[in-house]
């Protein structure tokens, strides 16, 4: 799928090129700690987890409980998974290739 051309510009290219230069998990932490607030990082991480849970077949109720994401955010991410540019699916697929259990529904243990 095509990327929205309204996003393509020199500043976005520069950011993405910088991200592509990161060589380790530690470098990612260092860079993103500098470039994002903790809240922004939590929001980005939460969106990826919502996408993973949707792709795994989790239901909205479980996703809300685990991530704290609103149903509006979950719906938007689901729309992106189904009709977006394919970025979520591409990354989730690659992560699942490295970890066969990545897209399994992870049930919380009840006390």
What are these regions (language model features)?
Residues 1-22:
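General nucleic-acid-binding
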Residues 91-111:
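Intrinsically disordered, low-complexity basic tails/linkers immediately adjacent to helix-turn-helix/homeobox/MYB/SANT
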Residues 26-46:
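Short, Lys/Arg-enriched anionic-surface-contact patches
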Residues 79-94:
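Short, solvent-exposed alpha-helical "recognition" segments
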Residues 11-15, 31, 49, 73:
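A general alpha-helix detector
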Residues 44-58:
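Short, amphipathic alpha-helical "recognition" segments used to contact nucleic acids or chromatin
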Residues 62-67, 74:
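Short alpha-helical "recognition helix" segments of helix-turn-helix
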């Amino acid at each position: 799928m095509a990327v929205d051309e309204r996003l393509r510009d020199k500043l976005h290219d520069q950011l993405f090129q910088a991200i592509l230069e990161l060589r380790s998990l530690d470098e990612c932490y260092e860079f993103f700690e500098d470039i994002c607030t903790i809240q922004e990082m939590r929001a980005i991480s939460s969106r990826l987890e919502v996408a993973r849970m949707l792709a795994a077949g989790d239901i909205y109720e479980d996703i809300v409980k685990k991530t704290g994401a609103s149903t509006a955010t979950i719906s938007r991410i689901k729309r992106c998974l189904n009709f977006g540019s394919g970025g979520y699916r591409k990354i989730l697929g690659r992560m699942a290739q490295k970890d066969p259990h990545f897209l399994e529904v992870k049930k919380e243990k009840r006390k």
